C-alpha cells in the first residue's frame, strides 16, 4: 500500500508499505477520503511538539472496513466509517470523568501513531464509527472537524439567548459558527477575522455579523452597538486575545480557548473575578463522534460550505502548500484515496 510519510520536518514522501493486518480488537479501513488540518501542516513543518518521526499524518479520515481482527464482529466488514483519532486508556482520572481527549496516556492517530493519509489504516474497532447510508462520503470525512465544535459547545453550553463572539474564521471557527446557529439556534453570532474572504465564508456558515479587526477597533464597534458578548470563543489562538475577551465580555459570560500557543498571555485577574467569568479550554473531542453524526442525519450542519478543494493524494504536497498559503480562497482541503 502507499502511505504519505513525513520522514522528518519538511521531508514528505509517498512510501510503499506492507499492508497492515488488524490485531485483536482492531479493524482495517480502506481509506476513501481524508482532510488536511493545520496540525498536519505543523507536523510537516516541524512545529508540532507532540509528533514523532517518521509519521503517517492525517487524523480526519473516512473509508470502508475491509478486514477485522480477533474479537470484532465480521458483520462490520463493508461498513462505511469515520475514525475518531483519540485513543485513550479508559482508566485514568480524565477518562473516569468523561475526558478521554486529555487521557494521561493519550494517543492521537496521525500525531503519536500513524494516521489516515494512507491507502489503508488499522484502528481500534471502537474508534471506527458507522456512517448512515444517506450521509455522503464528503460529509462523512468532515465528522472529525465538527467534533471540535461539539466539544467546544459541550463545554460552553450555548443558549438561544447568547450573544456569541468568535475570534477566527478558519475551519475551526467556521464549524463552530455552524454548530452555534444550526444546532443551538444562538440568536446572534459575531465573527472577527482580518481576512475579508474568510469573513464571507463565516457569513455563508450563518454568522449574523462579521468584523475585520485589522481595519478598526473591535472594542469600539461593540461599544457603539451596545453589545456585551455572553459567549466568546477563541479559534485564532493569539496571546493578545484572552485579555481582550475578558475586557469585552458581559458579566457572567463564558470564554472558551481552542488550540495551542506557547506565547504568554498577560491578563488582569480582577477582570475575571469582577465579572465572575467562566474560562474553559477545549482540546480534540471527548466522545463527540455520535453527536456530530446525529447532527448530520438531522441536517443541522452543512460541511459542503467549508470544502473548497479536493486533490488526489499523489498531489498531497501541492494540497498542503495551497492550504498553508491561500487563506483567502482555501478552507477545507480533501485528499482522495482508492478512487
Identify what each model region corresponds to.
Residues 135-215:
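Mid-domain Rossmann-like dinucleotide-binding core that forms the NAD(H)/NADP(H) cofactor-binding site
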Residues 156, 200-278:
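Glycine-rich cofactor phosphate-binding loops and adjacent beta1-alpha1 units
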Residues 89-167:
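NAD(P)H dinucleotide-binding glycine-rich loop of Rossmann-like/cofactor-binding domains
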Residues 196, 243-247, 286, 290-339:
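C-terminal hydrophobic helical "lid"/dimerization subdomain
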Residues 78, 161, 207, 228-230, ...:
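Local beta-strand N-terminus motif with an aromatic residue
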Residues 3-21, 38-67, 82-83, 100-114:
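N-terminal glycine-rich cofactor-binding segment
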Amino acid at each position: 500500500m502507499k502511505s504519505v510519510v513525513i520522514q522528518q520536518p519538511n521531508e514528505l514522501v509517498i512510501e510503499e508499505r506492507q499492508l497492515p493486518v488488524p490485531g485483536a480488537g482492531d479493524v482495517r479501513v480502506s481509506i476513501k477520503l481524508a482532510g488536511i488540518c493545520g496540525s498536519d501542516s505543523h507536523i510537516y513543518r516541524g512545529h508540532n511538539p507532540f509528533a514523532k518521526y517518521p509519521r503517517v499524518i492525517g487524523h480526519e479520515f473516512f473509508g470502508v472496513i475491509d478486514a477485522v481482527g480477533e474479537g470484532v464482529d465480521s458483520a462490520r466488514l463493508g461498513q462505511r466509517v469515520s475514525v475518531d483519532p483519540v485513543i485513550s486508556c479508559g482508566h485514568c482520572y480524565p477518562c473516569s470523568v468523561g475526558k478521554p481527549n486529555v487521557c494521561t496516556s493519550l494517543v492521537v492517530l496521525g500525531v503519536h501513531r500513524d494516521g489516515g493519509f494512507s491507502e489503508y489504516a488499522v484502528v481500534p474497532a471502537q474508534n471506527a464509527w458507522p456512517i448512515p447510508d444517506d450521509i455522503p462520503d464528503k460529509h462523512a470525512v468532515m465528522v472529525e472537524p465538527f467534533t471540535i465544535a461539539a466539544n467546544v459547545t459541550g463545554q460552553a453550553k450555548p443558549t438561544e439567548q447568547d450573544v456569541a463572539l468568535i475570534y477566527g474564521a478558519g475551519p475551526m471557527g467556521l464549524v463552530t459558527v455552524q454548530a452555534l446557529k444550526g444546532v443551538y439556534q444562538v440568536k446572534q453570532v459575531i465573527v472577527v477575522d482580518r481576512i475579508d474572504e474568510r469573513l464571507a465564508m463565516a457569513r455563508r456558515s450563518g454568522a449574523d455579523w462579521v468584523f475585520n479587526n485589522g481595519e478598526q477597533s473591535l472594542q469600539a464597534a461593540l461599544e457603539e452597538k451596545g453589545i456585551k458578548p455572553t459567549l466568546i470563543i477563541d479559534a485564532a489562538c493569539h496571546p493578545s486575545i484572552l485579555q481582550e475577551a475578558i475586557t469585552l465580555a458581559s458579566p457572567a459570560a463564558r470564554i472558551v480557548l481552542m488550540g495551542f500557543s506557547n506565547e504568554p498571555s498577560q491578563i488582569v485577574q480582577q477582570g475575571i473575578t469582577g465579572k465572575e467569568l467562566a474560562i474553559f479550554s477545549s482540546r480534540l473531542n471527548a466522545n463527540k463522534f455520535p453527536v456530530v453524526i446525529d447532527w448530520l442525519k438531522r441536517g443541522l450542519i452543512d460541511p459542503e460550505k467549508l470544502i473548497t478543494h479536493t486533490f488526489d493524494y499523489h498531489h498531497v504536497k501541492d494540497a498542503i502548500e495551497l492550504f498553508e498559503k491561500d487563506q483567502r480562497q482555501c478552507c477545507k482541503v480533501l485528499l482522495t484515496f482508492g478512487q
